[in-house]
Amino acid sequence: MRTLFFSSPLYGHIIPQIPLARAFRDRGDTVAFVTAREFAPLFAAERITLLPAGPTGEGVMEEMVCRTGVDPVEAGQTGSPETVVEMFAGVRVDLGFLDALAHAREFEPDLIVAEALDFVGPMVADALGVPYATMPFGPALPSPFAELFAAEVARACERRGLRCNLPDWYLDPCPPSLQCPDWQAPKGRIGLRPEAFRRDGAAGARAALAGERTGRARVLATFGTLFADTCYINSLLTGLLAQDFEIRLTLGLTAAEADFSGHYDRVEYFGFTPLDQLLDDVDVVLTVGGAGTVLGALSRGLPLVVTPQGADQPINASRVAAAGAGITFPPGRADPGSVAEAVETVLTRPEYRQSAQRIAAEIRELPAADEVADRLAAALA
């Protein structure tokens, strides 16, 4: 069997698909990924073929600025859905579809799997007459957002003489307690257990990240790859260190330890490190609320403090709060003192950890990636 994955050129979109891609690979199937060339080292480490198509994430954003005069990161922070829709369903499709289609014709897939904001894969599936599965990151998009995407995709398909076919399967990583209350499962829904990202083959033999505990609570502070504002993070560190915490801080893709001058003997800094390792031996996770981090933390039963900045983060934050698994703030820069107080609260009030552990149990009930790969292969046999 030949399975072709598609993803927008962003780590937070690619990484949730990796466990399923590994599962197909480990079955002995032929697996490849269509996304930007910049991710070649990631796929080489995974022993998965990369078929490079389309620009980098930065390239898509630069084209958005040229076309619209709007910075899509700033638009995501201010909650402008039209700009986000244009970036994923307009600009990225325009810049990547033809190369992706050429690669797919040569690859001859039996199945296409596309993350929920990749619209190139479904269009390629229609062009080739191949079944496809879509894979969201977490809770479903609110109806107004989904309707805007559907309208833009319809226009993109019409310009290319394609149909807007619904997916054959909806691979759902969202545990019930986090899902939007009015959501109805689409046809072809299959649960898929989310996993905190780990290096291939490293599940049982990874190096410890830290020495012995000092007795202080340990906070994992992770702010993703798009919204890592070092000035804001510095202010949050100051607030956290006024409390008696140890802090494990991720630097994202662009920051360096030197950006956090004056911080501090109780802070450990980490470049790009698998979340599976970062979560070891921590007590609470402070995050902007990307779906991968939220689901990864909850899979370990860890409570959260969420300070969303943009993209899908406000959606995830609202669902964490509704489930009782953490404290969340409105989008934007939260007051550092209030954030530190929230961390202290989720550490000292057991109901937050209890809710997180309940969701962890729900996640364990979802089918593992190898089960889902077998089920899809059987359906296509």
What are these regions (language model features)?
Residues 158-188:
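A short, active-site helix/loop in glycosyltransferases that binds the activated sugar's phosphate group
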Residues 48, 168, 189, 266-268, ...:
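Short, conserved active-site loop motifs that form the nucleotide-linked donor/cofactor pocket
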Residues 35-40, 116-119, 174-179, 251-258:
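Short, polar loop motifs at secondary-structure junctions
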Residues 53, 59-61, 85-164:
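Conserved nucleotide-sugar donor-interacting segment of glycosyltransferase catalytic cores
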Residues 1-8, 19-32, 142-143, 266-381:
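Nucleotide-activated sugar donor-binding and catalytic core shared by glycosyltransferases
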Residues 193-284, 294, 314:
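Donor-nucleotide binding loops and adjacent catalytic segments primarily
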Residues 32-82:
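Conserved nucleotide-sugar phosphate-binding/catalytic loop shared by glycosyltransferases and other
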